[in-house]
Amino acid sequence: MNLKLIAFSLALGLATVANAAADKVVGYFPYWSQYAQFAPKDIRFNMVTHIHYVSIAPSSDGSLAFADENDIENFKELSKLAAENNVKLIVSVGGIEQEGTLAEIAASEEVRGTFASNVASFLDENGAAGVELDWQNLTAENAEGFAALVNALKDALGGKTLSIAAYPLTSADAYDGSVLNNAEYVTVLVPDQMTEENSELKPNQSVAVIEEALNALSAKGVDKEKLLPAFSLYGKSFMGAKGFGEAPTGVGSGNEGILTYKELMKKFETPDYKVSFDEASKSEIAVSEMESIVFMGIPSVKALAELVKSEGYAGVAAYDLSQDHTEPIVSLLVTIGLELRPDVDYKAKKK
């Protein structure tokens, strides 16, 4: 580990005891982790309290199926290891391009009941602690159906956890605080803010924009102690721009301009990048001769955890577990944990 990274990591500071409400650390485990050679055995279970498995896909008749059947064995192993490590496994149902199907299900009382019953049975059969309803691109037109679906799930789940994924920056008008308050907690997700369509470089994700999303739901009447903000463990690279406000000329390095956090840490071991923390947005930017990379690193994730703790939010979610660095000194999960769960031993395990 070089001195540059160590100095960058000093932003961790000293951890203090978290408020009682800010006790959840959620890690997302998507089915595509298998293609990144990241298996359930690679999860550092002591770093999280909950794991959200992404995802289970619904059909319009209320039945359920794995989004990728190649991941069934991985899911079984995930369920086994989560139970052994006393981590709650939450199954995400819905997700990308599933809003049409969820709307069809919600429109029929009979199908809603079938769907909710199937979800409850799936949880029982697979040892899962609960479900996350992930209805993306929700519109005001579907708000009534969304509420009916939430109520059907709540009735069917009994004592199991109901979580809801919310996207307030794109669907604020569709949410009702009284509906979201039916959930044990609400994961607050923010879409990418910097894309190829933007004419000027800006943060892709930041504490500032996450706080905007949290405030939007609070204004809707959602209980603060139920709100759980999520952040992405990847950065986005753009050619040409040498800082915020400059015009990029195209996508930079990485897989279509996307670099996982652990890939970024490898890049920053060289002197090619100047990494700095932007106080206004509470996000990071790395600038080289060829490109700029916008991301959330240790200082911004620490600031997010501090916000959660000081405001009494439910916790923090990381999307996704495969992208973090495993060295404790640069791990973002450790950064969260030192703020919210300081009693945990975050030292690297001896091999």
Positions of the model-derived regions?
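Gram-negative bacterial Sec-dependent N-terminal signal peptides
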Residues: M1-N19
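Glycan-recognition patch characteristic of GH18 chitinases/ENGases
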Residues: A21-S121, K202-P203, S331, Y346
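Conserved, mostly hydrophobic/aromatic
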Residues: I51, V91, L133, V186, ...
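Short, well-ordered coil/turn segments that N-cap beta-strands
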Residues: D23, T49, N85-L89, G127-A129, ...
